Amino acid sequence: MSSSKIKELREGLMSSSKWSMAPGMMMQQNQPRPATTTPPISRGNEDADEGLNTARSFSSFQDLKGMSGDAKEQESATLVHLTKGRAHPRSRRPPRQISIDSAKKEETKNTGSTKAADTKSSVEATISPLKDTKSPSNASVFPIKPTESKTSTTKDSETAKEEDDASSSTTKAVEATTSKASSAHTDTLATSASNSDRGASTPEMVVKAEKREGSTSPIPYSSLSIAERIKQAQNTPFLESKVLPQNNETSDEENVDVKPAAGTVKNVMQAFLQPATPAKDTASKEPSKSSQQPVRTKPRIAQSPFLAQDAKENGGNVEVSSPLSFSASKSPAAVDSSTKTPTEQVNVVSKQAPTTSSTSVISPDPLQTAAPSANVNEVIASLESKVVTRRTGSGNNYRVGLRNVSGSERTKSLSKESPVEPEKPALPDATSSSTPTTENKESWTNQGIKSSQQRSANASPATSPSNQASIHASFTKESSTHSSPSFTLESLFSGAPRVVELTRFSQPSPACSRALLARWKEEYRTSIH
């Protein structure tokens, strides 16, 4: 607030101290106003001009002593309506309301052109003094007689006449003062606007200078102007936050996990988690990898035959980062991550969970640790359950992994495999409730559930069997009726990753693991602040 405005506010309050009220108090409805209260010291950060208007209307209120509290409240309600809802409940402007009533009366009384013109000017006169910022006390601007208080309730013809005389007599004087005041007002507005422009432009220039120098240190967020902050927020992609390694460690493992090379399974997941970033960003950040990492307008989906083919080539041992078809380049990063031992990967997952990085680490492959020569179908199922799924909008192709395999083959192979589940003594009801039907989608949904159940038994032995059983029951009961298991909160936070068939209303959801959820929350928080 400028100092001149503050001065005016103070003057207005001094003139109307009789009618002002304690700071921060709002008038309750149908409550008569107290006769004397202390003037507000400061109204906090509320609109300053609202305060000015309040002061002015209070000063004009001193004459309206005949009104009861209810009538005043009614009047204030109509006033709020007239001023487009901007007015405080306590900024009452009776002159405006009364004059409009009188104008209507005048028009009904006689329809002469001169009278109509008079009415117009009187209405203007009574509306415009609200903008008056110069006069110390507005009692002179609104010469309202006590008899006028009747006009709102008893609409007598005599009071109307009196009111007309009063308004027409002061019209000229009022117009003179208001024109002066309004010109001053516009001047102050112009100066403040230019000032704000200047203020906004300075941090921008600083940003540009820093960019020219090539320094990596960002400008503190607090020093940016609001426009600059908005621009910054629009330019940064949603999940790409600054990667802060935990405990100031910068090891190769972390770098591999944070920015995987193009063509790894993790990179496919990253494509689903991240919006398409413009090409110039990747180029400026890492010129070395910009050639390998294709800029995607839409997240590209890995076609399933390639997954199957990779599984066959690797002898069933599917690594976390097996190169997919759409990028043939095997970068050193991919080799690094594939040569890691399973225990290392587990460590990376646990260490990386709370940090803010743009990739999703989904729990290490149990097939890698448990059975190196697993069957191809199991491998595909587990891989499929790991890849983040997303509804792509057209039709029902929201499954990532196995979309293009012909249905009959898939059903045959899966129904052959799935009933054999010797590894789960903790879940007696699993095989009975989720034996696959002949229907294509249901059978492989059940298979996915079972494989993920098995994986959860491997990955998180800490989960209690009863908890797991209840989760499993909630899944299979649903999937036996219509192949889209709803995941409950319990299943969401149970620690084990789950295959979730997307229903119509669900968001793009990964296989829900606790680490991933925590990471998303963290990234969202950092992307906001």
Swiss-Prot record:
GO terms under cellular component: cell division site; cell tip; cytoplasm
Major place of residence: cytoplasm
Biased composition (Basic residues): 83-95
Region entry Disordered, spans: 1-222, 237-256, 271-372, 393-488
Location of the protein in the cell: Cytoplasm
Compositional bias of kind Basic and acidic residues: 1-11, 409-426
Protein origin, superkingdom: Eukaryota
Modification Phosphoserine, positions: 128, 217
Protein name (database record): Uncharacterized protein PB1A10.13
Lineage: Eukaryota, Fungi, Dikarya, Ascomycota, Taphrinomycotina
